[in-house]
C-alpha cells in the first residue's frame, strides 16, 4: 500500500471491519484524508481473494473475504415487525414509507401506533388473542395492491400505506400472513386458502371481483372479508354496487384505537426459528404454485446479511428508494423490511406505472431503484421514455427475480452513466436473497457474490460436485435462513434437501472469477427447463441470448418439445420488433432468424420450423417467463 502514490502512510487495524465508513477516521490512512472510496478500493483489491475451500471432495463457495459478518445475531424470539420497528437506528430519517400518488408520509411513530390499533381491532373482530390459539389457526390472506387510499373528513382523501402494517398486526397476534399475487386467479386463491386452512382475507376494490368469486367457492361469510380502498384510477372495472358491504381496515384500526392494550406476545427462546411469518406462493413458472413457509428468524437473518454486505458501501443508508415491486412477492417483502431497518424512505406505488415511477424519481430525488429486468429492457429499447425526467439522483439500480441481459445493462449504462446495475439472486425458498453485487465489482451477466453466512455447492448431472470455475451444475445452498418447507406438501419438502441438509435450488449455475479476482455466481437456467437433444443438454437461455442479438427480435422464450429422432428439440416463441424488418413476412423473418442462430450455435440449438411469432410472452409479476403456459400452448398445437 505504501507504494501507492496516493498513500502517505498506513495505519494497521483488525480486519474485517464492520463498515468502510470508519476508514476516514484512521490517522494517516490516506493523504489529506481523501474520500474513503480510495481506501475502499485499495482495501477491496487486497482482500478480494476467493474464500472457497475444498472439503471432503466438495468445493464449497462462500462470501468474499472483504464482506464482514453481520454486526449482530438475528434474534430468535422476536416477530419481524417488532424487530424492524425497534431497530430503526441506522439513520435519522423518519419517513420509511411515502405514497407516490399523494406524498403522504408515514413516520415511525405512526407505524407503531397503527400496528397496535389494527391488532386490537383484529383481535376483537376475530376473537383472537396474542397468546391463545396456534399460529396455524390465525392465517390471514392478503390479496391487494401495495397502496391504499381512504376517505377522510369532509370527503377528503387520506392516503395510507397499510400492507406491512397489516402484516405486522397479524404477527402481533401470533398469526401468519399469506400474501397473494394480484395476478392470482380465483381458483388459485381458493386452492391456497384451503391448503392454509385460511378463513380470513383482505382485498382491495381493484381486485374485488376475483376475491368474491373465490369467497363464493369457499363459502366464506362476508364478515371474514375486509377491504383496503384504492384511488379511483385503480378501481376494478366490475360493477361493485352489488358487492356486500364489507368492513374496511380503517374501521378495524379506528375500533382498535378505542380498545385497551393487548397483552405482550410471549415467545420462548428459539421460537422465531420455527414460527412461520409468511406463506409465500412460489412463482409456478414450471408447474403449480406451492406455499413456502418463511420464518421470522429467517427473514431477519436475511435483512442482516444484506445490510452487512452493503455495509461495505455505507452510502446506502438513509437513501430514498423506489420499487416497482408488489409487496405480495418475496422480493417485495424483503425490500420493504430492509428499508425500514436501514432508515430508507420508500416511495410506494399501488402497481407499476412507468411514467409515474420516472416522475417520482425526479420529484423525490430517488437514489435507488428496485426493478425487474423486463422493465429495464423496455427502458433500454425506448430511451425517449426517460428524456422528460431528471434521473440524475439515481446511483444504483437493483434487479432480481429474473436474469438481466448484459446487452440491456450496457445499453442503459451508456444512457445513464451514473447508474450502477446491481443484480441479486435468490428464491422464495432461500429466504430470500443469496447473492448481491458490490458496486466495486459490477460484472454484467452475473448474479453477484454470496452474502455472509451463505454457502453454495454446484452438483453436476451425475451427482458429483463441480470442482472447477466456469463449470455448470445445480446450485445447492445452505444458510441459517432457508425456508422450512412447503405447507401441505411433505414430498416436495423432502425432495428439496439432500441428506446433509443442502437445499436443491433447481437452478443451473456456475462460479466465475471476475477481473478483480472475486467469485461471482452466474445462473444459467432452471434444471426443469433444460432441453435434452440427442443426449446433450441445451440451455434455453443460451438460445434466447443468441436470438436477442437479432435486430428483429424484441423478446423471446425457448422451451423443449418432444422430437421423435432427437428426444427433444428447442422451440422459440418470438415477439418481433415493430420497427426493424417489419416489411418481412413471417416466413422470411423466420429464415433470417434461423440463419442468424445457426451461425452462432451448435446444431443441437437450432430451431428449424419450431419458431412461432406471438403478440406477448406470459410472465409473472416478477418478470419470470411462465413456461408451463408455453408448454401447454405447444402441446395444444
UniProtKB/Swiss-Prot annotation:
Signal peptide: none annotated. The gene is cm3C. Both substrate-binding domains (SBD1 and SBD2) are involved in the substrate recognition, and are sufficient to confer the substrate specificity. This is Acyl-CoA ligase cm3C. Pfam families: AMP-binding, AMP-binding_C. It comes from Cordyceps militaris (strain CM01) (Caterpillar fungus). It comes from the Eukaryota. Residues 424-486 are annotated as: SBD2. Pathway: Secondary metabolite biosynthesis. It is an enzyme of class 6 (ligase).
